[in-house]
């Protein structure tokens, strides 16, 4: 890609701080990679003195690959990495930090899920709520101590959130692990209190480039400011209009703070959108101009032609869903964007019932291992119990799969004693439950002596797990063939294992060949996210947050209503402005067509169109 005049000036910037205000589709990645190339080849900067920081591992890999291709190289000493990777590298070098010291995302997920079981929480979109809670925990840990007490969670009721948060911190402490927020604090304290270590890293990286700087938290910025002294060769690229991660501690004000910290910084505004048509850019600009706490940008489209933005109002959610279903049947690459994870549950259900495949999340197949599927986890729980483990979480997973009419009240302890459970049932004269419990115990004894293939078959046929799946699918109005296919593939994958322990170990670490990979991770509490496992769909369903950084030929924003977007818990000026930025991000994902849908009625409740629709 040839550079335009402003891009060229930014790329040629040499020493001293620089801020690149990069509007949507303005070629920010191109600017970063070309500047790295220019520093090395034109300015003769040693390549191992350059650090490029991104916010995701995928972005770091993509940027490095683009640089290597542009420079016609197979390897480079330039460091491309996330904040996470940089902080880990500093702590590893100074304190002997190990990867095993960092809590895994899966372990965080499992911990919160266990807390749900302990507190008897039952929500429909369990995966979405767990994800939100983990994000909010990170948000709270990034706040100053004086603000933590007044924090009001949006993921769940405050008392539950406080309980989970306290248990989470205790769990990390007793497990001798840290999360990303702990790593940031440790890195900050290390560099602030150890001048010789700070000096070492200041000399190591004399040129620092940061992508998506608007997403940086205050503590990340403080660390960066220490690292770039005294040379101040810091080159940030960001767009305060796309700052949408307030729940993680980011704020658009970090761009303003950069200007205050480096008052003599050069400012380059990339104001040409090479992605979207003129109609999309103009509509999005009208929207975002309603925000006051921002850098002004005179945005324009490289392609000023294009179809008008379409705004539709439907009588009901059902009518909206029917319209979308008919529209996406033309197989045109499309993204359906929602405000929350649960926002598209009914749409997914409808598409599933009508045989329309779709992808969830980042616009691509998720690539999740089939053994992450909740069905595989159910089988795993049966195997754990058959091997003599008595973890409450495993028992609660399968106690009513199939239904045994046994309440969780009989399993109060973390490690379950079957004899104690039977005693409680006897004290309550629950003969039917005693019979069902004895039947389960007998089934577990039988399974314990079987190889995995036979054990899975026994669980499916003798225990009645297949019957449970059929019943579940009838209740949810879902085609059972997909779930039966998962069970068949799980069972087939177990042929080469002789013991339950071998199979469990394989499930735990995912060491399995690619032919048993499955495209999606389903939540039992939510709906399956794709109705086929073979075809690659042109229909992508994801939240506005997860659409950031992506682009689509056609974008459909659904449920653009007050109380949904802006979210009903967004009250303050700052919160409303962040909601508007989120809507702006959603709009600017569209390359050619943008359709914005509102409904008059949802779940028998009357709704108003979003104020954002009126501002466009």
Residue map of PLM features:
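P-loop NTPase Walker
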Residues: 1-98, 199, 282-285, 588
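Helicase C-terminal subdomain and adjacent C-terminal extension
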Residues: 601-616
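ATP-hydrolysis module of ASCE/P-loop NTPase motor domains
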Residues: 14, 75-77, 95-181, 205
């Amino acid at each position: 890609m040839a550079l335009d005049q402003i891009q060229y000036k930014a790329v040629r910037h040499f020493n001293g701080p620089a801020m690149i205000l990069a509007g949507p589709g303005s070629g920010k990645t191109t600017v970063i990679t070309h500047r790295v190339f220019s520093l090395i080849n034109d300015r003769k900067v040693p390549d191992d003195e350059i650090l490029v920081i991104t916010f995701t591992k995928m972005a770091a890999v993509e940027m490095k690959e683009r640089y290597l291709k542009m420079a016609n190289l197979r390897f480079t000493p330039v460091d491309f990495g996330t904040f996470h990777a940089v902080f880990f590298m500093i702590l590893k070098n100074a304190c002997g930090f190990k990867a095993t010291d960092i809590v895994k995302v899966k372990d965080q997920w499992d911990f919160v899920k266990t807390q749900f079981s302990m507190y008897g929480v039952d929500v429909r979109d369990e995966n979405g709520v767990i994800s939100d809670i983990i994000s909010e925990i990170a948000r709270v840990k990034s706040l100053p101590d004086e603000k933590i007490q007044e924090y009001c969670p949006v993921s769940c009721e405050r008392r539950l959130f406080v309980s989970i948060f306290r248990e989470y911190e205790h769990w990390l402490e007793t497990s001798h692990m840290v999360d990303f927020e702990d790593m940031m604090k440790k890195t900050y304290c290390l560099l602030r209190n150890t001048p010789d270590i700070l000096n070492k890293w200041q000399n190591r990286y004399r040129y620092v480039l940061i992508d998506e700087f608007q997403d940086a938290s205050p503590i990340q910025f403080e660390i960066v400011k220490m690292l770039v002294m005294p040379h101040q060769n810091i080159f940030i690229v960001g767009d305060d209009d796309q700052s949408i991660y307030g729940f993680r501690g980011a704020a658009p004000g970090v761009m303003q703070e950069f200007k205050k910290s480096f008052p003599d910084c050069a400012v380059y505004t990339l104001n040409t959108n090479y992605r979207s048509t003129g109609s999309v850019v103009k509509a999005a600009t009208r929207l975002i101009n309603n925000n006051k706490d921002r850098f002004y940008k005179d945005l324009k489209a490289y392609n000023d032609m294009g179809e008008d933005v379409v705004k539709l109002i439907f009588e009901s959610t059902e009518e909206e869903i029917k319209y979308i279903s008919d529209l996406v049947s033309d197989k045109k690459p499309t993204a359906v964007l929602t405000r929350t994870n649960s926002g598209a549950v009914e749409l997914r259900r409808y598409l599933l019932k009508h045989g329309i495949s779709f992808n969830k999340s980042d616009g691509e197949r998720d690539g999740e291992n089939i053994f992450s599927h909740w069905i595989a986890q159910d089988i795993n729980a049966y195997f754990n119990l058959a091997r003599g483990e008595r973890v409450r979480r495993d028992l609660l997973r399968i106690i009513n799969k199939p239904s045994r009419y046994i309440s969780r009240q009989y399993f109060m302890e973390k490690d379950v004693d079957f004899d104690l459970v039977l005693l409680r049932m006897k004290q309550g004269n629950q003969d039917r439950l005693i019979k069902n419990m004895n039947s389960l115990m007998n089934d577990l004894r039988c399974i314990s002596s079987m190889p995995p293939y036979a054990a899975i078959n026994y669980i499916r046929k003798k225990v009645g797990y297949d019957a449970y799946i059929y019943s579940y699918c009838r209740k949810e109005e879902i085609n059972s063939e997909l779930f039966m296919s998962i069970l068949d593939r799980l069972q087939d994958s177990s042929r080469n294992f002789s013991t339950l322990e071998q199979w469990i170990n394989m499930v735990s670490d995912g060491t399995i060949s690619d032919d048993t990979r499955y495209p999606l991770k389903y939540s039992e509490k939510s709906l399956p996210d794709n109705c086929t496992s073979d075809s690659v769909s042109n229909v992508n369903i994801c939240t506005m947050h997860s659409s950031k950084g992506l682009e689509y030929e056609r974008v459909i924003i659904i449920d653009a209503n007050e109380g949904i977007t802006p979210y009903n818990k967004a009250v303050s000026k700052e919160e409303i402005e962040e909601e508007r930025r989120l809507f702006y991000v959603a709009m600017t994902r569209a390359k050619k067509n943008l359709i914005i849908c509102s409904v008059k009625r949802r779940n028998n409740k009357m709704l108003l169109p979003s104020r954002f629709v009126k501002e466009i």
